[in-house]
Amino acid sequence: MKDLTEGRPSVLILTFALPIFLANLLQLTYSLADTRIVGTFLGDNALAAVGATTTLSNLIVQFLMGMCNGFAIISAQCFGAKDMDRLRRSLGNSLVLGLLAAVVLTLGGLVFLQPILRFLNVPENLLNTATQYVSVIIAGLVITLFYDVLSATLRAIGDTVTPLIVLAVSVVLNIGGDLLLIVVLHMGVLGAAVATVLSQLIAVVVCAVYLWKKYEILRIRVDDLKLQDAGMLRNMLSSGLSMGFMSSLVNIGTLTLQTSINKLGQNIIIAHTAARKISEIFMIMFSVFGQTMATYCGQNLGAGKIERIRRGILLATGYTCIWCTLNIVTAYTIGDWLVWLVTGSKTPEVIYNATLYLKVDTLFYYVTAVICIVRNSMQGLGERIVPLISSSLEMIGKIVIAATLVPMFGYPGVIAAEPIVWFIMIIPLLIKILRMPVWRQKNLTVS
């Protein structure tokens, strides 16, 4: 456990963020390895099929992850206030609420999968392969949910090392499973999906056993599973749904944009898949410091230490801006090599378009860095509405661009989409946070 309410914020934020960074890097490394394995051993059609459905699976998975992170903000506030009974109850309630959401998403996703894929304009020659892959991912959502709840709760009490170790085990098993099921057993993209779900199942078991043995304060009882604390339930639903929908709105916009991308041909689908995989690594620190600040702000809000919150937000913003500069240098020096490394493709159209995406979008990363820090900090401070408004603007912007710029300009319209919406969505965030008590008061407590 790590108490983020005491000590130097500059050191605490970095030491707390480092394991999250390594965990996210491991996850993205697996994603890149998975892409390379599918592309190398199954070919461009299989890679395009997976790429055409990645946004859909991300939409669902990111909703669950965002929701669990929202639940964990309440846990962080309980931990910061040193209220261990409510901390334990928050974990029990998180499991119950999350399970209900996962079951609904699983059933809905499987029932409406075919209409959704057709809405996404997945090419007919890729439809069967895409269906096989995403069906397994959706069927494993309950497993994903349990992992998200446990890892988010551990981070809420300051333990970012255990989720890192568990994820490392999961990634190794996942890559090994890919090679076994795809290369040896010839299961195709179905093997890639099965390997993902099985590795997550093992991660859940390991994480649950460790949590039970290590942290007595988190050993939930039957009463902790009952949704009987109206105040906690209201706060958890508000925080969880806000962060879940915040993630979903972003992905709905991206999903709509993907429908236009899928009309541009197989090479563009592959190029965009590669560019997004690489940009996810480039943006990794935005997510890392965003998660860090949600927990940091939550704990310090619970402890009523508002000055530490102000300083922490400024420090995290500075750290991410340094990272942005490194991304720009990387995109302009070895961007094309990274595209080849991810896809294994030597097709000029793939290399050119993916590299162009990286070179243009990285120039505007400073804007999205501020967005991620401010949005997650506001969630940790209990502000739910404005982050949702900001995410809604992103969704609307991408939908409008998908309907206008992409038909007019093709893939360059896709490349321009995110920088445009970033400038739009940062406005309400900056207006709101500068008016919040965090910038005006010396002390603040949870209401």
Residue ranges and their predicted role:
Residues 47-107, 144-163, 271-330, 335, ...:
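Small-residue-rich hydrophobic transmembrane alpha-helices
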Residues 20, 24, 36, 73, ...:
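Transmembrane alpha-helix boundary and packing residues in multipass membrane permease domains
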Residues 68, 136-155, 163-174, 192-207, ...:
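Short runs within selected transmembrane alpha-helices of multi-pass transporters and secretion channels
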Residues 14, 18, 30, 67, ...:
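Residue-level signal for transmembrane alpha-helical positions in Major Facilitator Superfamily
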Residues 4-42, 55-70, 74, 99-106, ...:
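N-terminal transmembrane alpha-helices
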Residues 1-17, 75-140, 184-241, 297-364, ...:
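Short alpha-helical transmembrane segments in multi-pass integral membrane proteins
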Residues 29-48, 117-124, 180-187, 248-277, ...:
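Helix-terminus/linker motif at the lipid-water interface of multi-pass membrane proteins
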Residues 15-34, 136, 170, 199-203, ...:
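Transmembrane helical elements of multi-pass membrane transporters/channels
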